[in-house]
């Protein structure tokens, strides 16, 4: 079974010609959102297969026109659609992680298992790990080397060295 990654989400329609605003969640938008690429989307109970006609940057997001979407009304119906694709081939020495690789990792602090990564948030300043502590409390941990110096995918762990108070928030 191939793991699919979420590569974007339709935020809203844009203009009257059927463009949509897409929040991109991939490091390779030039590949994933190239004209002619076929995207597979899911939206509450529906699936879409859409071919990209044009894609252009707009205010930190992409404006995409699909061949199958003729107007704003059709574009409005795509709101909330999430696009998925299989992972791209990576070089063995390439840095970085896919969200699905981080989700489920056990969090280790001072040698103790203190929780598990339940999700990854993407923001303008970088990624943030959503962690559920063994106490049941949820915390957010910036995914930066100073705080998460080691990720061992084979062991299924991420070691953290949080500043004082981070886990108490």
From Swiss-Prot:
Subunit structure: Binds ribosomal protein uS19.
Annotated localization: Cytoplasm
Organism placement in taxonomy: Bacteria, Bacillati, Actinomycetota, Actinomycetes, Mycobacteriales
Pfam families: PRC_RimM, RimM
Keyword Protein biosynthesis: no
CC terms in the record's Gene Ontology section: cytoplasm; ribosome
Domain remarks in the Swiss-Prot or TrEMBL record: The PRC barrel domain binds ribosomal protein uS19.
Keywords associated with the record: Chaperone, Cytoplasm, Ribosome biogenesis, rRNA processing
Family as reported in the entry's similarity comment: Belongs to the RimM family.
Protein's name according to its UniProt entry: Ribosome maturation factor RimM
Stated role: An accessory protein needed during the final step in the assembly of 30S ribosomal subunit, possibly for assembly of the head region. Essential for efficient processing of 16S rRNA. May be needed both before and after RbfA during the maturation of 16S rRNA. It has affinity for free ribosomal 30S subunits but not for 70S ribosomes.
SUPFAM superfamilies assigned to the protein according to its UniProt record, in alphabetical order: PRC-barrel domain, Translation proteins
NCBIfam families: 16S_RimM
UniProt GO BP: ribosomal small subunit biogenesis; rRNA processing
UniProt cross-references to InterPro entries, sorted A to Z: PRC_barrel-like_sf, PRC_RimM, RimM, RimM_N, RimM_N_sf, Transl_B-barrel_sf
GO terms, molecular function: ribosome binding
Domain PRC barrel: from-to ranges: 94-166
